[in-house]
Amino acid sequence: MKTYLSDDRPQPESQIGAALESLAHTIHERRDAGEKSYTYRLLMGDLDKLLKKLVEEAHETTLAAKGIAALDAVAAAKPDAVDEKLRSAEVDHLRYEAGDVVYHLMVLLERCGISLDEFAAEMNSRMTMKFHYVKAWCF
């Protein structure tokens, strides 16, 4: 898998780190891209449009996950009833929709002035809290 970094920053150790850093950098640069850029319009336009898009993408992600769960339920009841190619396509669809959620969330964070490092610190702080809180956060 090729990882894209838009400048000479050192390569992050993980693919997810590299992907998120590259995306955050690109989103930040789009502030100067002008009206032709979709990201620019999300950053500089009506906040409600960005929020609506984030909710829409989250909804599509939940529907994709429900599709996988439905296939898994059918497969549990009747193991030969679900084609693995169909399930694989559903997983690909979930991955695609999750990417849309992450992109729109990162645009929102950029718009609100929250850096990727600040977001990572928030996530890390949640992982170091007492077990009962982390358990509740993770359902």
Question: Where do the language-model regions lie?
Answer:
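Flexible "arm" and connector segments at domain edges
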Residues: M1-A98, V102-F139
